[in-house]
């Protein structure tokens, strides 16, 4: 029952069936701390219920997690975007890409896993995941991608970004 230690399930997979699978504790991966799975389950429950108190609670939890690692920050930004917490999502992304507000560091999740995301090699693909659609519709997204230099990349490649096609 070992699985790859990637904790970013993406919001596409979250639904009632996913919640039912997560509730089956006997078949969960044995190499991931149950609290890590539970933290994502709480996000899925907030997405399903749209309960303001649940959304507030997972936003607070994942803001705290974002301070502990780059992988947590990637997940936090996606979760917050999907939950409509765009101010918080942008704050996490500013920390992740530019160390503004706080520094999420280079460790992805836990130092023991030996997985790192160097500050000079941050992932940009997460910006185009389905969970980030609300974020992309916000005017601050253009400023973010400009600061990251993505329009220069697209111009040089001669291709339009997929999300604008």
Language-model-detected regions and their locations in the chain:
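Alpha-helical protein-protein interaction modules
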Residues: 1-165
